[in-house]
């Protein structure tokens, strides 16, 4: 049997790291947040919510949390000296709310929660800070270009209140970059003081470029990122918005594949899920559903030979199997070596690994008369998952994320984004956040859970099958004895 390696090869040049592992060469300076000079205005929240000030919910203190509280080596406690600044409402502001224009843009693929973030930013800016104006630029960074700047719309509380129940993005989106100088010209033309960039790593790299051009011109504009990655692969982030919704919707697809599989003799259900470089959705949905028997992710290379042996192992114990595969898995297989080019964001187009696996399984089963009634069903729910509204949990998460982003941006924080880290909302410089990619640790807790609910081909398959039959026989005997005992009392 071929032994799978611990890590797959990806096309990305971005360094990758396991969630709870150290990132090499981290330095405290990499977590230092830029702030526009001067805080000369008192927040209206001080007057509105005096009890919050007394309770120190609103303050000007710079509070940090430990970057890594996990113990390492022989020590029983963490030795990490790195910290991340906590996000909170501030007493002193850099921007005068009455003269502040807030703008936002959504970029890249759609994701559950985008409209909740648009809504949260608008309501916090309008209702809490009473800013001069909130502007939405349409269709991603194109809306900031010369060609698209005329499509900008003003956002009000009445316009955004109903967005909670809608999928997609109210502002529209697009991929690909635009001329940085033109985009900054648009910000100047509209008198924008704060720009929120809602998108993935490509979007946030664009935000860094905008911030640098703003600095070069000496403009008083804050550029603040709100990370969007349904794959949950953002570094220095425990969870990204849309991820929990995606896992919940993925479980529905897995249940459908399971229903198909158990309805046929030697039925096979295949579900392809999002996960270009990181398999968090596939792994979490596998654990949550407890109906998947094989989980394939980019972080864990598995050969075709090993895959087929795992299928045979399952078929020795049952007559159905569900395979969950992340879209980035198997791209180094010979079947996936066709060059499909890149999309507008520069991402390599992937071969549909779900279709590849379907054909491999069909060919394998067709060679064995035992499987003459087998069937293989393939489900790709990706776009349905991306386009649905956020779950209740994700919607609340988006509200917290966007509200705190407004608080910190009003205080002059710039070139940073907001993330959740060990149940706390923290600020991370954009450059640091996009310098690494988070991946599933195949030696960590999540992958351990996956291994516990899926087929394990590492042992003696015949012995495992015998033990399973023995357990079932004991259960049947116990049930029979119970019935006999009840009959004897009649």
UniProtKB/Swiss-Prot annotation:
Binding site for ATP: 109, 175-176, 200-203
InterPro entries: ATP_PFK (IPR022953), PFKA (IPR050929), Phosphofructokinase_dom (IPR000023), PKF_sf (IPR035966), PyroP-dep_PFK_TP0108 (IPR012004)
Domain of life assignment: Eukaryota
Keyword presence, Ribosomal protein: no
GO molecular function: 6-phosphofructokinase activity; ATP binding; metal ion binding
Entry GO CC: glycosome
Transmembrane segments: none
Cofactor section: Mg(2+)
Reaction catalysed by this enzyme: beta-D-fructose 6-phosphate + ATP = beta-D-fructose 1,6-bisphosphate + ADP + H(+)
Location in the cell: Glycosome
GO BP terms: fructose 6-phosphate metabolic process
Function per UniProt: Catalyzes the phosphorylation of D-fructose 6-phosphate to fructose 1,6-bisphosphate by ATP, the first committing step of glycolysis.
PANTHER family: ATP-DEPENDENT 6-PHOSPHOFRUCTOKINASE 1
Protein's UniProt name: ATP-dependent 6-phosphofructokinase
Gene name tied to this protein: pfk
